[in-house]
C-alpha cells in the first residue's frame, strides 16, 4: 500500500506463531494488506525468567515507557526552541543515526551492543532506565546554562526597546550632548510628550533657577515622545525634576559615563558570542541524544511486546510481532479485521474491553485497552501531546 495513504499512527501487535515460520505473518498480511502497511517487528529471543518476574516487569516497563516518552517530548520541544528562526528544520534533525523515525521503527533491529541479549529482561530495563535518567538530567543542565544566556541577552535587548520613558539611552546619546567633568553644571535627559514640545521649548529655562538658557537640545523623537537635554546647576536638579514632573516632563535617571556605556556594550557582545559558541555543540548534543532516547524508547516497546506476548501466549516463546500503520480513515475497519482474525485467541471477547475495572489483573499490567492480541499504540509525532 502507498505510504502516502497511511495515517502516521503505528500499532505494535503480536499474535501467536504458527507451524510455518511465516504462516502467522502471511495470514496477517492477507487479511489487512489493503488497509494497512505492515512491517515485521524483529524482536530477538530474550531471557524469559519466571512468571512473577514478568508480571512485575510489565508494570515497570509501562512506567519506563511513559518516562521515556516524556523526556522525548521535552527534548523535542527544547530542540525546537533552540532552533529559533530555523524551527522548520526540526524534522530533519530528529534522526536515529542516518534513519528517520519511521524507517527506524518499520525496519527495527535490536541493538545488541547497547542492550546485550545475554542480560535478563530486568537488567535490560535497568540499562534503559539509567540511560533515560542520564539524558533527562543532562538536558536539564544544558538547557539551564543556555537559557541563562538567552535570558540575560533578552533582558539587555528589552532595555533597547519600548518607549523613551524606559528604554536604554546608550545608543541615543553621544559625549558631545553633555557638559562633562564640571564641578557645578550637569546635563540631564528629559522625556517630553510630543504634544508639549512647544511648551517645553518655551518654558524649560524658567522651570527653576540656575538653568542654562539655550542649553536644551532635541536628541530624538520616537512614538509619542521627544528626548531633550538641558544643562543646569547640580544643586537645583531635584527641584527641577519635581517642577518638570508637575508639567508632565519626565527627567530620566541617567548620567553619561563612557566607561559604563562601553562596559554594557562589551557585556552584550560577550553574551552574544558565548551564545553563538554554545549553539552548535548544543544542537549536536540534542540531535545525538534524540537518537539515543528514541532508540531506547522503541526498545522499551519491544520489551513490552515480548513480555506481554509471553504472558498471553505462554511458553515456549513463539509469536509474530508486527508494526502496523493503518491507512487513512481505515483504523476502524482494520480493528474489525484484526478482531475477526484473532477472536479465537480469547473466547470471551466479543469485542475489545474498553473498561477494565472488572479486570484487576489486566489493570495491574498497565493495560488500558484490551484486544485478543497484544497491542500497543505508538505515536511518533512529538510536537504536541
Curated annotation (Swiss-Prot):
It comes from the Eukaryota. InterPro entries: ATPase_V1-cplx_csu, Vac_ATP_synth_c_sf. Keywords: Cytoplasm, Developmental protein, Hydrogen ion transport, Ion transport, Membrane, Transport. SUPFAM superfamilies: Vacuolar ATP synthase subunit C. It is found in: Cytoplasm; Membrane. Its main location: cytoplasm. The keyword Calcium does not apply. GO terms for cellular component: vacuolar proton-transporting V-type ATPase, V1 domain. The keyword Membrane applies. One of its GO terms (molecular function) is proton-transporting ATPase activity, rotational mechanism. It is a peripheral membrane protein. V-ATPase is a heteromultimeric enzyme made up of two complexes: the ATP-hydrolytic V1 complex and the proton translocation V0 complex. The V1 complex consists of three catalytic AB heterodimers that form a heterohexamer, three peripheral stalks each consisting of EG heterodimers, one central rotor including subunits D and F, and the regulatory subunits C and H. The proton translocation complex V0 consists of the proton transport subunit a, a ring of proteolipid subunits c9c'', rotary subunit d, subunits e and f, and the accessory subunits vah-19/Ac45 and vah-20/PRR. PANTHER family: V-TYPE PROTON ATPASE SUBUNIT C. Belongs to the V-ATPase C subunit family. This is V-type proton ATPase subunit C. The lineage of its organism: Eukaryota, Metazoa, Ecdysozoa, Nematoda, Chromadorea.
